[in-house]
Amino acid sequence: VHSLFFLQYQDFCRHKKSCQFHDSAIITEIGNFRKADNPSITGYEFHVIQLVSQVCPHRLILPYLAETLEELKTREPEPKFPFRARVVLVGSEIDDPEFTKLIETCGAMVVADRYCFGSFPGREQIEIREGETAFDAICRHYLHWNQCARFMDGMKIDQRHSEVKKLADEFKADGVIYENMKFCEFWSYEKILAHHIFTNELGIPTCTIEKEYALGAVGQLRTRFQAFIESLEIKQIQGGK
């Protein structure tokens, strides 16, 4: 085991220059289009792109991602913003883009994806500092900046709330949807506290749901999402009160 680990460590060291050469922020650049008042990409489309980028060999998918990025720079959005609200989606893993599509068909665009397999914080650039190997940089990043809900100390909890608040501000979200997959206890605890913090202390409307791994109980979820979106619309009409 030690020999295998040492060989892998050597590979990381050897590939530092390769990492720097291939370093790319294409997914981040594509995702940033969602910050626009009338984005040229939907949350569902971005979810598909993000998922594909995680399961396809990079050397095969990068040319297509670069092509997509260039297309989005000249893509004309709908004449009028086609959604009734903008939301940040936070929580357990969501590897089914149909879940994002469900939210958007209810009337809310998912402008930021802060969940397991999402681009926040999964697509954050890992800085390789002077004198560090790629392996060291990855270890440092995950030990000091990991946003997983399994880290339960107060500093990490506050850090996660601050990051979601930052996303809501940057992407001009009207509200936040916290979801946890059934039996994911970490996000189950997180969403309860987050609902209180965001609703009562930060003044950001928050919806919390529990979901199965497979997209079931669609009618129930649709009812919850529609009611939440309606409450966001009412808040907009009342001037954010």
Residue locations for each model-derived region?
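A polyampholytic, Gly/Pro-enriched intrinsically disordered region
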Residues: V1, G131-Y142, R224-G239
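A charged, amphipathic alpha-helical module
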Residues: V1-R123, D153
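Extended, charge-rich low-complexity interaction segments
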Residues: F6-C13, R140-R160, I234-K241
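Flexible loop/turn segments at secondary-structure boundaries
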Residues: I94-E98, G118-E124, H161-S162, F183-W187, ...
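Flexible internal linker/loop segments at domain or repeat junctions
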Residues: A112-D158
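A short, acidic, amphipathic alpha-helical segment used as a generic capping/interface helix at domain edges
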Residues: M155-K172, E190
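Acidic beta-strand-to-loop metal/phosphate-binding motif
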Residues: A173-K182
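Peripheral docking tails and interdomain loops at the edges
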Residues: W187, I192-K241
